[in-house]
Structure formats: structure tokens, C-alpha cells
Regions:
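The feature encodes the CheY-like receiver
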Residues: 15, 56-58, 87, 105-106
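Acidic, metal-coordinating helix/loop segments flanking the phosphotransfer/catalytic sites
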Residues: 31-49
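C-terminal output helix
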Residues: 107-117
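Hydrophobic residue at a beta-alpha junction
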Residues: 32-33, 58-59, 68, 97
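Two-component/phosphorelay signaling modules centered on CheY-like receiver
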Residues: 12-30, 119
Length: 123
């Protein structure tokens, strides 16, 4: 059974390219364009990993991460934060609230695939 990834970003071009790339790698994919939709998709799609943009409408990636980490049933869910703000304080905040990894935009798609496969144990 293929691993499931939820892509959460409000930039359509990023969503389209990530969705294409991850499907090509054999992952099952769902997408959400804001934080509220992300939380609903986690409940219905039950992903193994979330690629979560930090800056989004309705709920930020930080708020989504905090909500998921507060839910014991989501303890095994891997969260990778995506951001254009690569400042140390942003990275530290993301990791402190429970993100498993942090990727700064722009990123190498090849490196991202390697990172996700390693995290999901399918490398």
C-alpha cells in the first residue's frame, strides 16, 4: 500500500508541482489550500505525512501543527513545514511546536523526495 501525503499550500503552482512529483514517486496524494481545510483532510484522508506551508489563510501552518500535536490519535503523523522564511527563529518555532522537519522555499525537488522517502521508510 502506498504512503499517503497531504500537501497543504495556498500557492497553486507549488501544489501542482508537488502533487505531480509525489504521484510520480508512487505516493497517494490529497491537497488542501488553507489550514482549516488541512485539518478536515487529515481526518478524512488519514495521511502518513503532511507537507505544511507556514503562511496560509484561515489557520497558519503553525496553528495546524499545534492542533495536530494536541491530538493523541495523530501522534504518528509526520509533519514537514514548508516556508519562504528560513530564519532561524521560524525554524526553531516550527520544530518546537512539533514539526518533524523544516524545508525552506525554494527547495530542490530531488532533495525533498529523498527526505520524504527517508522519513517514511521507503528510501
Amino acid at each position: 500500500m502506498s504512503k499517503k501525503i497531504l500537501i497543504v499550500d495556498d500557492e497553486p503552482n507549488i501544489v501542482i508541482s508537488l502533487e505531480f512529483l509525489m504521484k510520480k514517486e508512487g505516493f497517494a496524494i490529497a491537497v488542501a489550500s488553507d489550514g482549516e481545510e488541512a485539518l478536515a483532510k487529515v481526518a478524512s484522508f488519514e495521511p502518513d505525512l503532511i507537507l505544511l506551508d507556514v503562511m496560509m489563510p484561515k489557520k497558519s501552518g503553525f496553528e495546524v501543527c499545534e492542533a495536530l500535536r494536541a491530538d493523541p490519535s495523530k501522534a504518528g503523523l509526520l509533519i514537514v513545514m514548508l516556508t519562504a522564511k528560513g530564519r532561524d527563529t521560524e525554524v526553531a518555532k516550527g520544530l518546537a511546536i512539533g514539526a518533524d522537519a523544516y524545508v525552506t522555499k525554494p527547495f530542490s525537488t530531488k532533495d525533498l523526495v529523498v527526505k520524504l522517502k527517508t522519513m517514511l521508510g521507503v528510501a
